Amino acid sequence: MQRRIFEFQGLRLSYLEAGGQNTSKLLIAHANGYAAGCYDYLITALAERYHVCALDFAGHGESQSTLGFSNWNFFSAQLLALTDHLGWQRCSAIGHSLGGGSLLRAAEVDHRRFEKLVVFDPVMLSFLMILYVKLFGNPMAKVARARRPTFSSKEQALKIFSRHPANRSWEREAVAAYVEYCIRATTQGAELCCAPAVEAQIFSQTEFAHLFKLGRIRNETHIVLPPKSNVCADWVARKIVRHNRQSGIHRIPDSGHLLPFENRRLTLEIVSRFL
């Protein structure tokens, strides 16, 4: 994997690149608070067949940070800008949570850009869920603001996250990748790459407009969900897949929102099946 840089709205954004230039194109978009490198196992495995690029969204990984955004279109625009930078007229894409929701919003803008989408529990809230967040706030934003931002070292961070109850179901390699790509060394020790304020602002931003554009998504789309999703409304998922006979909604038994970190082998199998 090689790390690259490009400019987006005055920000320096980073992405990981792997695979042959003359193979089919594949874009990967990560979840809120994480980074492209958390999906290193997908990048490495799929680079045998694809030219893979995985973006660090602004404020994540090695990309420059900002609080200067007002909705999630900021993130879908970054994905489209990266494909423009790469000269990709058409590609397939994998997204998780924020990354999945941002890819779907990007497909609303330009569905011809994408051949296939495989999105894991994408954040696509219903009208009522959006209204709740607007009125009462998102509980996840409160969790993000309270997140510990600094550590004495990356080694200490690895010990903490390896034992943390929230990571109990994660594979060991996934925890190691999180510390490698989402925590950076500083002169004082180590800190989160994604500042709690950025993560919280992302969780707090909801809007209705994209729900009126779901019919624009015409490309083959596979929505991979846990038995019960808290972030992707059933009717939204159905509306997304209704315009392409190859599209589908796939519920994975005994899985959760963080499946790509809890079962990497199964995640790769699912991706390989649908791409």
Go through the PLM ranges and name each one:
Residues 57-94, 269:
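Active-site loop/oxyanion-hole signature of alpha/beta-hydrolase fold enzymes
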Residues 11-62:
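Conserved HGGG/HGGXW glycine-rich cap/lid loop of the alpha/beta-hydrolase fold
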Residues 183-242, 251:
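Conserved serine/cysteine hydrolase catalytic core
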Residues 27-31, 96, 225:
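The conserved beta1-alpha1 loop
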Residues 255-264, 268:
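Catalytic histidine-centered segment of alpha/beta-hydrolase-like enzymes
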Residues 148-205:
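Conserved alpha/beta-hydrolase catalytic His-Asp/Glu region
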Residues 88-132:
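Conserved hydrolase catalytic core segment
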